[in-house]
């Protein structure tokens, strides 16, 4: 037994969920959630995106990121593993605003998409105004390609710096 570890448990009905408490201060999530609609975003089929992220991430070691290139009409996912293995897939998207190239960890993308209970997902590109640091992206549900968010689900992801690719 480790005396330095603390657990928290939540019980609802006949289910109990336990979690390890992490020391430190939890970041203020509200500062990362915009109060108004984000003008630049892509709409993609949720299941197609999950499947593609899973496939291209098969060539990656551990928790390496996937390069995501959002262009007019398509999203290109690319994964590289030390120049030995690589994978690439393209998905149709509806893009509003300028294209974007970001790098995301597949595990976190799939975790975020697991909460989307609609046919389509909106990936919004926030702009924090710092060109030296990638701005967060917001994943939310969307009932149809041309519809607004269908529920209140929002998931914030922080991209990684793109180095050498």
PLM feature spans:
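DNA polymerase processivity clamps
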Residues: 1-22, 35-165
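Specificity-determining recognition surfaces
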Residues: 28-31
């Amino acid at each position: 037994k480790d005396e330095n570890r603390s657990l928290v448990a939540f019980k609802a009905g006949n289910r109990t969920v336990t979690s390890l408490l992490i020391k430190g201060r939890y970041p203020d999530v509200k500062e990362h959630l915009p109060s108004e609609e984000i003008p630049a975003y892509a709409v993609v089929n949720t299941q197609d995106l999950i499947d593609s992220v899973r496939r291209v991430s098969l060539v990656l070691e551990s928790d390496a990121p996937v390069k995501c290139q959002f262009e007019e009409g398509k999203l290109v996912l690319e994964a590289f593993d030390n120049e030995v293995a690589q994978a690439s897939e393209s998905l149709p998207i509806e893009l509003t605003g300028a294209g974007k190239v970001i790098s995301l960890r597949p595990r976190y993308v799939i975790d975020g998409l697991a909460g989307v209970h609609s046919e389509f997902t909106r990936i919004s590109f926030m702009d924090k105004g710092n060109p030296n640091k990638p701005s967060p992206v917001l994943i939310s549900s969307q009932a149809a390609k041309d519809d607004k968010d269908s529920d209140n689900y929002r998931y914030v992801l922080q991209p990684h710096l793109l180095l050498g690719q």
